[in-house]
Structure formats: C-alpha cells, structure tokens
C-alpha cells in the first residue's frame, strides 16, 4: 500500500547552479534556501562541497538560520575506484559539511561502468556499497541517486536492478531513479519505475531532465507508478535544457493526484511568488506561459472563452488559479469579444449589457486600433479608455494642446501645454522630461497624480509589429502603490509613442479614480 505523502528534494542550488549563464552568489543561495524552507520542501540540496569553496561556505553559513522544515543535504559522488571510502575526498566532504543528509550519485548503466569508469560490473557494485555504507556509519540519512538508471535499465535490466538493490542493502534510505540524459518517455518511466517499486523495499525517488521535453510528465508518471520522493528545481532550471520544474510537479502531485506534500495546500499559494523571486535572482524575466504560475496561465483572450469562463470558470480552467497564488485575467484584442471588455468595466464598477451597441462599437474600435499596431492584451488600460469614450463616461481631464522635446546628450527639455497651463521641465531623456512637465501642469488641479510612478518601459521596434512596417509600439507600466496598469502608444516616432502611452497612463488613473469616487454603477 503506497503512502499518500510525497517527499520533495529541491536541487535548485546544486543542479540549478549548473545552468548555462547562471551563477549564484552565497547570498543568493541563502535567500533561495530560506524561501524553499518557507515553501515547505523536505530537502534542500545545497551544493557539492568537494567541488568549490562557495558550496563549502554555504553549508557553514546556513547553520546560522533556523529552518522550519527542510533538511539541508550535501551532494557528492560514490568513492573513486582507486581509493577506499575512508580516504575518498567526495565522501569526506559530505561528512565535513556537517549535514543530516547526504545525496550520493553512482553508476547504474553498464556502459558507464565498463566504458567510462573502465572497471568491472562487480567492482562498481562494491563502490556503491562501500560509499553508501560509509555515510550511514557516520549517522547520515542517505539519498542514493542512480545515475542514468532508465537508460541502463533498458540496456541491461538485471544489472540496473542489481545496482539499486546494492544501495538498498548498504542502507540507503531513498533510492532515486535518474533520467540523466532526459531521453526517456512517460510510458517507459511508468513501466520501469513500477518494476523497481516491486523489487526494492525502500522509498523510490525520481530525478528527471528535460532534454526531450518530458521532465514534468515523467516525474508525475513515476509517482503514479509508486515513487514517493521527487527531485527538481524551481522553474526547471538546470544542466542543458533543465530539470523537472517543481513549480509544475508539486501542484500536479497535490491537486491532480490528491497526494500530500510540502506543508499542505496553503503552501501551493506561495508557488507563484517563489517562482518570481528565483527568476529575479537569476536575472531572467518570468515566463508568462509557465503552467500554473505564468501571467498568461489563466489568461483568456478569445471572446468565446472569456464569455464561458465568466459564466462557469471550469469551462476553460483546469483549476482555480488562486490555489497556486495566481489570478484569472482577460485580455482585450482583435479576437476578443464584448465579454472581455465588460470584464474590465465591471472591475471599475460599471455594469453594462454585452449586447449594448456602445460595447460593440468599443470592441470594433479596439480591433481597428490593433490592426494599426496596438496590442491591448499587453496594455488593457488603453483599451478601457476607448470603451469609456464609447460609453459616454469619459471626462476631458487631460487636454494636451502642445508638447515638444529638445534632446541633448545627457539632458532632455520638454515643453508642454496642458489644460491651458504651459510648463517646462528637464529630465534624463525625453520620456522622463515629458513626465515631469505633465505632472507639473496637472498636480495643481490633481495633486493625487504624484502617487503615480512609472515601473516599466518597453519599446517594440518596426518589423516586430504585425501588419505594420514602420511604426513602433511603446508600453509603459504604472503603479499608485496599490494597483498596477499598462498603457501604450503607437507611432512612427518612439518619442511620440512614448508620450501617447504616458498621457494614457496618467489619464487612466484620473478617469478610473473619478469613476470610483462618483460610484458610477449604471449608465
């Protein structure tokens, strides 16, 4: 009878550190370890202490922090063929790291034994036994990673099984089946893992690489077959094409298979934030298409989809997005319908019927603007301004009569005339100078405009915009400290597109603030 709980070993700090173009500082590793402990993983593989001084330092530094659940594990290889376990540097570095858990990898593919290590099959079994037994004799919990297990099993089942049985006999607490080359398919993983589960009494684990795109699916199928320990990294970073993404594996195990893991379902709500922080640390922009936690994972663009989801969320969503700390989103675009527009209006407290001809007019105008280069799925606030105009709810709060930018090497000067008020401002670049000038003109009437900050600025160049050859699209993100919104401008000039997006962003804030304050519910 299989247990209902699945252990999680995170190897972001070890296998994830082997990702090309990624290098963790010691502070990065500590920060991630504390984040993983808060999430509720069972083991944190901190690194390979015999390979570099930074990992050695990590095992010393992490002792200064009190972890709530996770156990720190040190990684290493089985003993070298020419040394005894007692003399082996890798094994002794694990003991020296003063951790509770040692993760050992050893050979289970006969090809690696005879052609890489160039030793006999029996000699490799002795190496496995000696290494595991040595760590156990020092009081460590041992997780044995059977490297290249699935490939080895397919070529020599008897020897692969003998290798893991040897680790079990030596006292290994968990035996992990590794798809090191990442080439095994899900149905193979299921059949092979099930066979191992029937031959080995200790807990079976899984360590999958993503070279054929199946790391997550392979991990899930291994759990279905009876494995109760999974390994992976946050966001799937790792050697070559990466490891199994724990951000996907964990909710699949808990929400789809109904098994227990981490600290329970409350931990799942932290997945999006954990994913975001790790992306931030490695300097990679979050993948918006990432299952479960990506910004687009529960985003509905097609009008038919949006309409159905607004009636019954299960119609086009496999789970409630809030379970994993995410949110449902609707975007406005050329394939969107009235339901998408209504969603954003209802967020402002505006109730309208989707059959209202004014809504249909707004949708048509949005589609026409998209054909000219706009992309409102990236900047829905600009589309809301279009809808407010068609609904007759738009107020002329900002009337820019004139603007001009004089751009020198390190300084830009902007002159604007807003609502009859002429202002001049200096800034670092044209967008900054126009922003300052606009605020100077507006703050006398709308002092609340000073709450608004620019948080992101992006330019999409000509050739990247569909149906256009010469226009540029500028998207700007704003915040008032409580909510965020994006607007955009399209023009043949980067500066003009920026000014359009900037004016829209400030205008959106004032328009929506007026709507909320006046409690416009029906019109």
Swiss-Prot record:
- Reaction(s) catalysed (UniProt annotation): pyruvate + acetyl-CoA + H2O = (3R)-citramalate + CoA + H(+)
Q: Does the keyword Transferase apply?
A: yes
EC assignment: 2.3.3.21
The entry lists its GO molecular-function terms as: (R)-citramalate synthase activity; 2-isopropylmalate synthase activity
Xref: Gene3D superfamilies? 1.10.238.260, 3.30.160.270, Aldolase class I
Tell me where on the tree of life, at the top rank, the source sits. Archaea
Regions crossing the membrane:
none
Q: Keywords in alphabetical order, please.
A: Acyltransferase, Amino-acid biosynthesis, Branched-chain amino acid biosynthesis, Isoleucine biosynthesis, Transferase
Annotated SUPFAM superfamilies: 2-isopropylmalate synthase LeuA, allosteric (dimerisation) domain (SSF110921), Aldolase (SSF51569)
Q: How is its activity regulated?
A: Inhibited by isoleucine.
Which pathway does the UniProt entry assign to this protein?
Answer: Amino-acid biosynthesis; L-isoleucine biosynthesis; 2-oxobutanoate from pyruvate: step 1/3
**PANTHER family assigned:** (R)-CITRAMALATE SYNTHASE, ALPHA-IPM SYNTHASE/HOMOCITRATE SYNTHASE
Entry similarity comment: Belongs to the alpha-IPM synthase/homocitrate synthase family.
What is the documented function of this protein? Catalyzes the condensation of pyruvate and acetyl-coenzyme A to form (R)-citramalate. Makes part of a pathway for isoleucine biosynthesis, i.e. the citramalate-dependent pathway. Also displays a low alpha-isopropylmalate synthase activity, using 2-oxoisovalerate as substrate, but is unable to use 2-oxoglutarate.
Name listed for the protein in its UniProt record: (R)-citramalate synthase
Q: What is the lineage of its organism?
A: Archaea, Thermoproteota, Thermoprotei, Sulfolobales, Sulfolobaceae
């Amino acid at each position: 009878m299989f247990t209902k709980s699945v252990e999680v070993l995170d190897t972001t700090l070890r296998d994830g550190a082997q990702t090309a173009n990624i290098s963790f500082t010691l502070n990065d590793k500590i920060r991630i370890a504390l984040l993983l402990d808060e999430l509720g993983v069972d083991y944190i593989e901190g690194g390979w202490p015999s390979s570099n001084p930074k990992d050695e330092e990590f095992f010393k530094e992490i002792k200064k922090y009190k972890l709530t659940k996770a156990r720190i594990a040190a990684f290493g290889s089985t003993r070298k063929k020419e040394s005894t376990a007692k003399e082996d540097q890798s094994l002794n570095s694990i003991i020296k790291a003063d951790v509770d858990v040692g993760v050992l990898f050893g050979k289970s593919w006969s090809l690696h034994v005879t052609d890489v290590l160039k030793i006999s099959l029996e000699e490799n079994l002795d190496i496995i036994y000696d290494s595991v037994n040595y760590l156990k004799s020092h009081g460590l919990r041992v997780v044995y990673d059977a490297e290249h297990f699935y490939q080895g099993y397919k070529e020599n089942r008897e020897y692969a099984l003998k290798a893991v049985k040897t680790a079990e006999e030596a006292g290994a607490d968990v035996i992990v089946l590794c798809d090191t080359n990442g080439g095994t398919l899900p149905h193979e993983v299921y059949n092979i893992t099930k066979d191992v589960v029937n031959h080995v009494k200790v807990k079976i684990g899984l360590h999958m690489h993503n070279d054929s795109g199946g790391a997550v699916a392979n991990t899930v199928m291994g759990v279905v077959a009876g494995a109760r320990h999974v390994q992976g990294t946050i966001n799937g970073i790792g050697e070559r094409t990466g490891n199994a993404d724990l951000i996907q594996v964990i909710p699949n195990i808990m929400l789809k298979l109904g098994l227990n893991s981490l600290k329970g379902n409350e931990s799942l709500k932290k997945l999006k934030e954990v994913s975001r922080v790790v992306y931030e640390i490695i300097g990679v922009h979050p993948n918006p298409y990432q299952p479960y936690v990506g910004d687009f994972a529960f985003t509905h663009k097609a009008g038919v989809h949006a309409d159905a989801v607004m009636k019954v969320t299960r119609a086009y969503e496999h789970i409630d997005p809030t379970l994993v700390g995410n949110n449902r989103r609707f975007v406005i675009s050329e394939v969107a319908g009235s339901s998408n527009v209504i969603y954003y209006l209802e967020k402002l407290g505006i109730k309208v019927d989707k059959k209202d001809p004014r809504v249909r007019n707004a949708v048509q105008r949005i589609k026409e603007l998209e054909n000219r280069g706009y992309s409102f799925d990236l900047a829905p606030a600009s589309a809301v301004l279009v809808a407010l105009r068609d609904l007759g709810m738009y107020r002329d709060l900002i009337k820019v009569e004139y603007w001009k930018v004089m751009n020198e090497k390190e300084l830009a000067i902007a002159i604007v005339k807003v609502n009859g008020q002429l202002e001049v401002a200096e800034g670092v670049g044209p967008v900054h100078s126009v922003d300052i000038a606009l605020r100077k003109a507006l703050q006398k009437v709308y002092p609340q405009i000073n709450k608004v900050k620019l948080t992101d600025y992006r330019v999409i160049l000509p050739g990247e915009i569909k149906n256009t050859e010469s226009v540029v699209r500028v998207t700007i993100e704003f915040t008032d400290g409580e909510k965020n919104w994006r607007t955009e401008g399209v023009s043949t000039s980067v500066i003009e597109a920026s000014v359009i997006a900037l004016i829209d962003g400030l205008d959106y804030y004032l328009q929506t603030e007026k709507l909320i304050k006046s409690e416009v519910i029906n019109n």
